[in-house]
A protein has these predicted regions:
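Residue(s) in the substrate-gating loop at a strand-loop-helix junction
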Residues: 138
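Active-site helix of classical SDR
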Residues: 118, 154, 162
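Alpha-helical segment proximal to the catalytic Tyr-Lys
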Residues: 123, 167-171
Length: 185
């Protein structure tokens, strides 16, 4: 059985279905988890269910605050070993009906925010000479889906970005991988 004892883990989007399952799994494997999300009630529920978890409300769409956020996370956890970029949104619409804002917002949150989280986490991981990043993408990033051109593009971009980051930092003992789930409830 894998053991994450002593590993400090940041999970974004921790209050949704996949994020919640990740929190539970990492805690069951003795990881030290800091869970983030934008829903205060759900974060409070996580804290009640798992008193030893760290929770922090944070909106990843505010890129100007991501560097300070990572600094805060590493202070709370006393380091950062694993980043799981799970936060993301959908704004489904057929391409001809899709508003510019729907396109931009999905790309901005799913792809751009993930890049900035990786960038600032990698700075910390380089100092520790160790790091693991897992970006939660989607099967839609590989296949496309009706009414999800923005979401598919954002997830495909995450895959390509992750491959590039993996190549850049492999020799520094930092791995970057993707998990592409199918449809969930």
């Amino acid at each position: 059985m894998i053991n994450f004892k002593g590993k400090k883990i940041l999970i974004t989007g921790a209050t949704g279905g996949i994020g919640n399952a990740l929190v539970k799994k990492f805690l069951s494997l003795d990881g030290t988890v800091l869970a983030t999300g934008t829903n205060t009630d759900k974060l409070d529920s996580l804290k009640k269910e798992f008193p030893n978890i760290n929770v922090l409300k944070f909106d990843i769409s505010d890129h100007s605050k991501i560097e300070d956020f990572i600094e805060n996370v590493t202070s709370q956890l006393v380091g950062l070993d694993i980043l799981v970029n799970n936060a993301g949104i959908t704004m489904d619409n057929l391409s001809l009906r899709m508003k510019d804002e729907e396109w931009k917002k999905v790309i901005d949150i799913n792809l751009n925010s993930t890049f900035y989280l990786c960038k600032h986490a990698i700075k910390k991981m380089l100092k520790n000479k160790y790091g693991r990043i897992v970006n939660i993408t989607s099967v839609v990033g590989h296949t496309g889906n009706l009414g999800q051109s923005n979401y598919a593009a954002s997830k495909a971009g995450m895959v390509a970005m992750s491959k590039s980051l993996a190549i850049e930092y492999a020799k520094k003992n930092i791995t970057v991988n993707c998990v592409s789930p199918g449809f969930i409830q």
